[in-house]
């Protein structure tokens, strides 16, 4: 037995019962609030409209936030709510200290924060440090060359060719296509923008700017929030000038000959620079200032679409801790509608193998930048993936609507408003548009799915909302939402909170894992990725389990046994594209620790 302060979560490798290599993952016996947290992302424009303008707002969130507590959520993360011209829907901030008027007032925010505190929900805000809006006062002052703001952004005079013609400082390409450099007539220099030209990059090689952004964090921490999700981290730093010049990036050799496409280059100079990790550590020091005051842990969650070894590096080290939760996007980037059980296991192990010792895993299946689970991975597998999300060891993150299996809504070119898509053309915009995954939340079968009473909403409500909505699923005997709620409730039991973890694949398509606590019992989770029903060889895969009769805790809708019934695992067959959670208690102490 390990000491009480340490539990081993054993990840068994291989495709059979032939041995395993254990991977120890530290868990404190007395869990901190976030260590087994269930987090939920709200996209504020799309959650609930309280004033009838067709746009979600803070009062709407406050009015409906009890729903999140009801479905078993611990922490809520809000996408940006700060003052913005909305060229990138809040990721272009013109005042880091003010609330966007469409969303409400500072008083509305404080009311929301108080409501969250009163019902035990932890509130997380987006922090967008890479850039501001070009309408930010600091950019205006920087463009005019006024100190101390002159070097708050990244400026360069460019390069003169033999004919005296001025060109951008380097060949760097924006994430949103085209040159990452924009000429300013006022300053007579180029400024860097890794995203839109209206989103100039901040200069983190300027200590005054670094302190400015730390003060932004302190302002919101003083409002009582529990932490930050930090946006677009790989772009925070670029390589430094060499002899007054920036190095060009090499051609990628990928399947594009479009020089405006960011995939045209390999981003050796503009992504994943080593200084980024130290900056995250500095931000961790800021939130730790507040933790030290009252012994309530404030957390950092990081967003970085990059190689897994870079993602996990954001955990930091014992000497220089970083993010408690560097988002794990492996289940998003590595899985498709055609993925097999082995593909799923490979995605899981790609993260657990890369994690540093003592770190806590997290699992993310969707967000505002990626197609919804039901559309990307298959409607039939929506419950299967939510079962996995809630039963794998570690932290779970759910994007609004995934609990009811919302789907992407097709949006025409004429109605498209996402800048990533608008920078493309009618033939290719769907490859880039994120509008389909940001449609209004489907509360009911009423007007605009209960989201708003406006004549027109900011994005159209998805087709099929009359059948697919919260009210209908709460009323149904079985539903995606009720399965989700069964899972979140059971997740708080010791078997899922503390249980050792042994993972198996059976053939190509059946995944099984066992979570167990000595003296308490065990849980077996089975996920059938195959096209045919699958038997569950529990006894052979997990020697020592003994009993063949197990209690059903939750299952996919197409799986027949309902929660609370018992099945004989020797006889039962799990339906295709389905998951099931089975329990056997051997003791009585399965309550939360």
From Swiss-Prot:
Q: Does the keyword Cell division apply?
A: no
The EC number of this protein is 3.2.1.20
Annotated binding of N-acetyl-beta-D-glucosamine, by residue:
338
Annotated residues that bind Ca(2+) 2 are located at: 130, 201, 235-236, 238
Per the record, what are the reactions this protein catalyses?
Hydrolysis of terminal, non-reducing (1->4)-linked alpha-D-glucose residues with release of alpha-D-glucose
Q: Which SMART domains does the record match to this protein?
A: Aamy
- Similarity field: Belongs to the glycosyl hydrolase 13 family.
What Pfam families does its record include?
Alpha-amylase
Q: Does the keyword Cell membrane apply?
A: no
| This protein's name | Salivary alpha-glucosidase
């Amino acid at each position: 037995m390990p000491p009480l302060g340490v539990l081993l979560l054993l990840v068994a490798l291989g495709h059979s019962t032939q041995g395993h290599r254990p991977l120890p993952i530290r868990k404190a016996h007395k869990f901190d609030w976030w260590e087994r947290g269930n987090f939920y992302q709200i996209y504020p424009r799309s959650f609930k409209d309280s004033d009838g303008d067709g746009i979600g707002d803070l009062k709407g969130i406050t009015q409906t936030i009890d729903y999140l507590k009801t479905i078993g959520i611990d922490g809520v993360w809000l996408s940006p709510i700060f003052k913005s011209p909305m060229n990138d829907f809040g990721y272009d901030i013109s005042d880091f200290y003010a609330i966007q008027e469409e969303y409400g007032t500072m008083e509305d925010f404080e009311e929301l924060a108080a409501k969250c505190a009163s019902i035990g929900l932890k509130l997380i805000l987006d922090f967008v440090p890479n850039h501001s809006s070009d309408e930010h006062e600091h950019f205006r002052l920087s463009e005019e060359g006024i100190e101390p703001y002159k070097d708050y952004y990244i400026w360069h005079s460019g390069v003169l060719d033999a004919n005296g013609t001025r060109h951008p400082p380097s060949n760097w390409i924006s994430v949103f296509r085209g040159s990452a450099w924009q000429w300013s007539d006022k300053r007579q220099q180029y400024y860097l923008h890794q995203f839109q030209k209206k989103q100039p990059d901040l200069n983190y090689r300027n200590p005054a700017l670094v302190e400015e952004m730390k003060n932004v964090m302190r302002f919101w921490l003083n409002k009582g929030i529990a932490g930050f999700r930090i946006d677009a981290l790989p772009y925070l730093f670029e390589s430094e000038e060499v002899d007054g010049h920036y190095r060009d990036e090499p051609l990628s050799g990928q399947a594009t000959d479009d020089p405006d496409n960011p995939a045209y280059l390999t981003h050796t100079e503009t992504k994943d620079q080593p200084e980024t990790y130290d900056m995250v550590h500095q931000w961790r020091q800021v939130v730790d200032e507040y933790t030290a005051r009252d012994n309530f842990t404030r957390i950092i969650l990081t967003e970085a679409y990059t190689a897994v070894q870079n993602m996990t590096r954001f955990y930091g080290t014992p000497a220089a801790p970083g993010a408690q939760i560097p988002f794990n996007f492996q289940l998003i980037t590595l899985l498709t509608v055609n993925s097999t059980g082995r593909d799923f296991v490979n995605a899981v192990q790609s993260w657990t193998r890369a994690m540093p010792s003592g770190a806590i895993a997290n699992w993310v299946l969707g967000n505002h930048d990626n197609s919804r689970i039901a559309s990307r991975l298959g409607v039939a597998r929506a419950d299967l993936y939510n079962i996995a999300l809630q039963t794998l060891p570690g932290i779970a993150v759910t994007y609004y609507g995934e609990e009811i299996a919302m789907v992407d809504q097709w949006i025409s070119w004429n109605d498209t408003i996402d800048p990533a898509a608008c920078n493309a053309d009618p033939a290719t915009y769907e490859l880039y548009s994120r509008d389909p995954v940001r449609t209004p939340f489907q509360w009911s079968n009423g007007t605009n799915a209960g989201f708003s009473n406006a004549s027109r909403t900011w994005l159209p409500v998805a087709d099929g909302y009359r059948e697919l909505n919260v009210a209908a699923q709460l009323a149904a005997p079985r539903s995606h939402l009720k399965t989700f709620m069964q899972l979140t409730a059971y997740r708080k039991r010791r078997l899922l909170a503390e249980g050792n973890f042994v993972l198996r694949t059976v053939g190509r398509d059946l995944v099984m894992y066992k979570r167990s606590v000595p003296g308490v019992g065990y849980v077996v989770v089975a996920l059938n990725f195959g096209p045919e029903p699958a038997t569950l060889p529990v006894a052979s895969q997990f020697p020592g389990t003994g009993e063949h009769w197990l209690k059903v805790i939750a299952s996919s809708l197409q799986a027949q046994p309902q929660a609370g019934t018992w099945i004989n695992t020797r006889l039962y067959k799990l339906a295709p594209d389905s998951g099931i959670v089975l329990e056997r208690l051997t003791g009585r102490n399965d309550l939360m620790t």
